């Protein structure tokens, strides 16, 4: 493609409202342009990258045996009312009415539509399993769209839905989708992890998220430094320490702590090591529990895990922290002075707390703490559970290595849905005995447009984007120097351009006649992996200058061998 026919819209300055590097670079490189909050137009340059991701996704989905279709983006309310999600979904569901005042929504997902399709089209167990997918624009009315296409309101998504006679069949397809996703993100050139995840509002029995590792990621993920274990921090098990509880070394004593309202205050003012302190958090108890409130105890340097906490049978779900008024009414002290000694409400302690000795905690009297508390001597050990978020250095739950914590950008999510939608909507087939059987479902999503942003977050430098080979809008940039002043150079550059095209390279031929610095800056900003620079001196020597986007130095390459040289470099990149 000639630059004179493919105008670049690069920017020198970073837009003030762009918070993350991918948003900044996509705007500066001229890949996207904002239309309204959370709505972006993809320019020809950006669309080339988007289509690359889409092509890889389609290739691997087809390879895995999925069938592509296309469903309407606008969905009738009746389907969502059947599934129960019309009432459950919040304001992120864009609802609308047609001229006949019939209610619709702009689909954020398509579970209802595909289930309706299957209950009409699939009648026998012989037609199963089947896996349908589409690549389509979705809309979610995010309360605060941000980070460019990373969290836009309108986005391109690949969503797939599989249907089965039983759980075993679902697990087979789920495993194939896991493998397909692994191939997709590997081919995209991304450093990613597949992590155990919560099924969330979509529901189901098992779930994995695929996260691209990046400092700007919104999710914290924990993974082993030895094995393939990985999980969202919220779901990673905090393994109980292998050590035994140390014997008591101090007497329990009541200490005046009038200004210690937080763990940090306690550490700073009274010299306790933070790992020798305990936080007491009071939450609403489950309906029918022995008391309306229950206390959860974690070590002072640990954080309560809300997902783990609300899965306890004693705790109300969703998790609700007690108000100060409720706490004072039940305990007689404020939140900064709570602890397990003489606590008048039930409590559960974290595994790490159960192994503590000589620790400090609130005395359930305002402005007072007990120091030197020991289980079994000063009070009985309450029920023990895994209540906390894991931290870096914790043992991996699979027994192999230690956990590392990194930020991740979720780009894919796969679910074993079970029968949630098929039961609600009556999606059945006839089994071998001619009896009606409710089908079992799986669903599998990839944020196609989000992959583009995630790739940039992971692949950039001070000059701009560094595209992985498979995602680059063009693979080779051809930059003639001062070609407007030399017909000989123009003809040589034109001839090389044709050679490159005929050899199958995706070439961006910068024939704009810009000065070299401006031309090189644009090529680095938009991230083309391979740059060829042709000048009069090189032409005389039968050479061309080569520089890879990740290289610090240039290389002189013989003009007649440049095609083979490029092929070698590209093969090495894979």
From Swiss-Prot:
HAMAP family: Pro_tRNA_synth_type1. The keyword Nucleotide-binding applies. One of its GO terms (cellular component) is cytosol. Transmembrane segments: none annotated. The gene is proS. GO terms for molecular function: aminoacyl-tRNA deacylase activity; ATP binding; proline-tRNA ligase activity. Homodimer. Belongs to the class-II aminoacyl-tRNA synthetase family. ProS type 1 subfamily. Keywords: Aminoacyl-tRNA synthetase, ATP-binding, Cytoplasm, Ligase, Nucleotide-binding, Protein biosynthesis. InterPro entries: aa-tRNA-synt_IIb, aa-tRNA-synth_II, aa-tRNA-synth_II/BPL/LPL, Anticodon-bd, Anticodon-bd_dom_sf, Pro-tRNA-ligase_IIa, Pro-tRNA-synth_IIa_bac-type, Pro-tRNA-Synthase_IIa_type1. Consists of three domains: the N-terminal catalytic domain, the editing domain and the C-terminal anticodon-binding domain. Catalyzes the attachment of proline to tRNA(Pro) in a two-step reaction: proline is first activated by ATP to form Pro-AMP and then transferred to the acceptor end of tRNA(Pro). As ProRS can inadvertently accommodate and process non-cognate amino acids such as alanine and cysteine, to avoid such errors it has two additional distinct editing activities against alanine. One activity is designated as 'pretransfer' editing and involves the tRNA(Pro)-independent hydrolysis of activated Ala-AMP. It catalyses: tRNA(Pro) + L-proline + ATP = L-prolyl-tRNA(Pro) + AMP + diphosphate. Its EC number is 6.1.1.15. GO terms for biological process: prolyl-tRNA aminoacylation. This is Proline--tRNA ligase. It is found in: Cytoplasm. The keyword Transcription regulation does not apply.
């Amino acid at each position: 493609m000639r630059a004179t026919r493919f105008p670049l819209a690069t920017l020198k300055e970073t837009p003030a409202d762009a918070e993350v590097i991918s948003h900044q670079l996509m705007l500066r490189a001229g890949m996207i342009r904002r239309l309204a909050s959370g709505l972006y137009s993809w320019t020809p340059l950006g669309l080339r990258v988007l289509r690359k991701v889409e092509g890889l996704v389609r290739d691997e989905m087809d390879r895995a045996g999925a069938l592509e279709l296309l469903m309407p983006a606008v969905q009738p309310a009746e389907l969502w009312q059947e599934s129960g999600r019309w009432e459950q979904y919040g304001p992120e569901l864009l609802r609308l009415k047609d001229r006949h005042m019939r209610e619709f929504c702009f689909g954020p997902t398509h579970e209802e539509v595909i289930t309706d399709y299957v209950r009409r089209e699939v009648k026998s167990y012989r037609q199963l399993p089947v896996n349908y997918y589409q690549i389509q624009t979705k809309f979610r009315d995010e309360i605060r769209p941000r980070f460019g296409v990373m969290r836009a309101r309108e986005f391109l998504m690949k969503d797939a839905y599989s249907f089965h006679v039983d759980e075993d069949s679902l697990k087979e397809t789920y495993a194939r989708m896991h493998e397909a996703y692994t191939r997709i993100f590997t081919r995209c050139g991304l450093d990613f992890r597949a992590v155990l995840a919560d099924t969330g509002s979509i529901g189901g029995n098992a779930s994995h998220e695929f996260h691209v590792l990046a400092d700007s990621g919104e999710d914290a993920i924990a993974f082993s430094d030895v094995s393939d274990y990985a999980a969202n921090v919220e779901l990673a098990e905090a393994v109980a320490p292998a050590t035994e509880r140390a014997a008591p070394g101090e007497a329990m004593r009541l200490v005046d702590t009038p200004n210690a309202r937080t763990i940090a205050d306690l550490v700073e003012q009274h010299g306790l090591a933070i790992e020798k302190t305990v936080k007491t958090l009071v939450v609403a108890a489950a309906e029918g529990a022995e008391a309306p409130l229950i206390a959860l105890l974690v070590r002072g340097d640990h954080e309560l895990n809300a997902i783990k906490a609300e899965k306890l049978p004693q705790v109300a779900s969703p998790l609700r922290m007690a108000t100060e008024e409720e706490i004072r009414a039940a305990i007689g002290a404020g939140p900064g002075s709570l602890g397990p000694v003489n606590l008048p409400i039930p409590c559960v302690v974290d595994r790490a707390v159960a192994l503590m000795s000589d620790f400090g905690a609130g005395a359930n009297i305002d402005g007072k703490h007990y120091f030197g508390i020991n289980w079994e001597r000063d009070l009985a050990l309450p029920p023990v559970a895994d209540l906390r978020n894991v931290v870096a250095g914790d043992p991996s739950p699979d027994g192999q290595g230690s956990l590392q914590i990194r930020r991740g950008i979720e780009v894919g999510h796969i679910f074993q849905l079970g029968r949630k939608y098929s039961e609600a909507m009556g999606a059945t087939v006839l089994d071998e005995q001619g009896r009606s059987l409710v089908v079992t479902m799986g669903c599998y999503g990839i944020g196609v447009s989000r992959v583009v942003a995630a790739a940039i977050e992971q692949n950039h430098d001070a000059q701009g984007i560094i595209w992985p080979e498979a995602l680059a809008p063009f693979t080779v940039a051809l930059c003639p120097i001062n070609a407007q002043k030399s017909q000989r150079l123009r003809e040589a550059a034109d001839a090389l351009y044709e050679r490159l095209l005929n050899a199958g390279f995706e070439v961006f031929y910068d024939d704009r006649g810009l000065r070299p610095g401006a031309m090189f800056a644009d090529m680095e900003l938009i991230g083309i992996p391979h740059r060829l620079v042709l000048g009069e001196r090189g032409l005389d020597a039968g050479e061309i200058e080569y520089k890879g986007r990740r290289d610090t130095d240039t290389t002189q390459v013989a003009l007649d061998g440049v095609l083979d040289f490029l092929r070698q470099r590209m093969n090495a990149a894979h």
